């Protein structure tokens, strides 16, 4: 009886210790644990800390968005993508620049909001990494207080980029050394990978720290969710329309689409399924940016055991030919991505026969 009680007490103490260890695992500590004795450990940990700081600043601004002037609404300008720019787009973009400008960690920042990369001034410490980012994904959701996010990717500079064209960034997604996103929702979460699994952290407002909540996340092989803007149905080719008709006819599927890649992908990462943003007949290249959105998410999903595809090619195999290149995106559980691809292959077979 005594031995049984002692074992139970020991088990309780072990559980409490494990919970305490988890509660004490901050983002920077976790990165250092992941990299162990790597010579890059301190730099990558500092990089992630800075990204986390940018996320905290943006999250704080978003929580007061309706109370502050010059926060919601449009600026009246368009970005390099030809899209109307929200005031929070500019704020979020400037936050990342401010956070990294004096860090000594990066040499450039490339954003979907800027036509050309921002080069760290010569009077500031200059690092060897490049941060590519979408400062505020889903900003059309802002005025209705729905989920938005930030997406990031880290690459190492190759060469000296003397001509300022950043051609070394025009490589495939396997060249990324870190990627992730920050989700601004009921809580603020940061999800990242440095090539050793996918890990999720929640911002504890009382501590001001991102605390580990899920380690080594694995996406289910198949899931019930399909996430796509069906308002574009008649703009797609037959393969996409056939896929949508298939999930409408078969039980076990549920549609979820929130208008922000980060929020929609986050659900699929945990529940399984597929997110689609295919090209249209008029714009087969799609809408999402390869370097700032598709490749970082592709890196994450592969680390979690899923897949990301253009429909004909793995996202991480795509070599960019320009900084703001767009690409179709099919991302999620392996079985669900393969199902979408099967409709694309069938349509090509029919077209070739014709």
From Swiss-Prot:
InterPro entries: FBPase_C_dom, FBPase_class-1, FBPase_N, FBPtase, Fructose_bisphosphatase_AS. Keywords: Calvin cycle, Carbohydrate metabolism, Cytoplasm, Hydrolase, Magnesium, Metal-binding. CDD domains: FBPase. Belongs to the FBPase class 1 family. Homotetramer. Mg(2+) 2 binds at residues 134, 137, 293. This is Fructose-1,6-bisphosphatase class 1. One of its GO terms (cellular component) is cytosol. Binds 2 magnesium ions per subunit. Its EC number is 3.1.3.11. PROSITE patterns: FBPASE (PS00124). It catalyses: beta-D-fructose 1,6-bisphosphate + H2O = beta-D-fructose 6-phosphate + phosphate. Substrate binds at residues 137-140, 229, 257, 287. It comes from the Bacteria. GO terms for molecular function: fructose 1,6-bisphosphate 1-phosphatase activity; magnesium ion binding. Mg(2+) 1 binds at residues 112, 134, 136. GO terms for biological process: fructose 1,6-bisphosphate metabolic process; fructose 6-phosphate metabolic process; fructose metabolic process; gluconeogenesis; reductive pentose-phosphate cycle; sucrose biosynthetic process. It holds the Pfam family FBPase_C. Gene3D superfamilies: 3.40.190.80, Fructose-1,6-Bisphosphatase, subunit A, domain 1. Its cofactor is Mg(2+). Pathway: Carbohydrate biosynthesis; Calvin cycle. It is found in: Cytoplasm. The gene is fbp.
């Amino acid at each position: 009886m005594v031995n049984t009680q002692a074992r139970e007490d020991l088990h309780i103490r072990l559980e409490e210790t494990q919970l305490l260890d988890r509660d004490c695992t901050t983002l920077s500590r976790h990165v250092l644990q992941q990299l162990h004795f790597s010579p890059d450990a301190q730099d990558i940990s500092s990089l992630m800390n800075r990204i986390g700081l940018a996320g905290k600043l943006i999250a704080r601004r978003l929580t007061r968005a309706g109370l502050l002037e010059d926060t919601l609404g449009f600026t009246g300008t368009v970005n390099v993508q030809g899209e109307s720019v929200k005031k929070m787009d500019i704020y979020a973009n400037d936050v990342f620049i401010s956070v990294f400008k004096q860090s000594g960690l990066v040499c450039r920042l490339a954003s979907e909001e800027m036509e050309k990369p921002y080069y760290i001034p010569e009077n500031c410490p200059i690092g060897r990494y490049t941060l590519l980012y979408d400062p505020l994904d889903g900003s059309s959701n802002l005025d209705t207080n729905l989920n938005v996010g930030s997406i990031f990717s880290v690459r190492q500079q190759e060469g000296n980029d003397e001509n300022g064209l950043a051609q070394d960034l025009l490589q495939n997604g396997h060249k990324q050394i870190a990627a992730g996103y920050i989700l601004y929702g009921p809580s603020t979460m940061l999800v990242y990978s440095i090539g050793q699994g996918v890990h999720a952290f929640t911002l504890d407002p009382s501590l001001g720290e991102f605390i580990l909540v899920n380690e080594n996340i694995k996406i289910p092989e198949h899931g019930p969710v399909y996430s796509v803007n069906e308002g574009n149905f008649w703009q797609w080719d037959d393969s996409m329309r056939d896929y949508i008709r298939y999930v409408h006819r078969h039980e076990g599927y549920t549609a979820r689409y929130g208008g922000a890649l980060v929020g929609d992908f986050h659900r699929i990462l945990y529940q399984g399924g597929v997110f689609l943003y295919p090209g249209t007949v008029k714009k087969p290249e799609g809408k999402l940016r390869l370097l700032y959105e598709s490749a970082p998410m592709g890196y994450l999903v592969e680390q979690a055991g899923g897949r990301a595809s253009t429909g004909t090619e793995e996202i991480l195999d795509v070599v960019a030919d320009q900084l703001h290149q767009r690409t179709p995106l099919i991302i999620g559980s392996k079985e669900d991505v393969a199902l979408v691809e099967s409709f694309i292959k069938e349509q090509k077979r029919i077209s070739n026969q014709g």
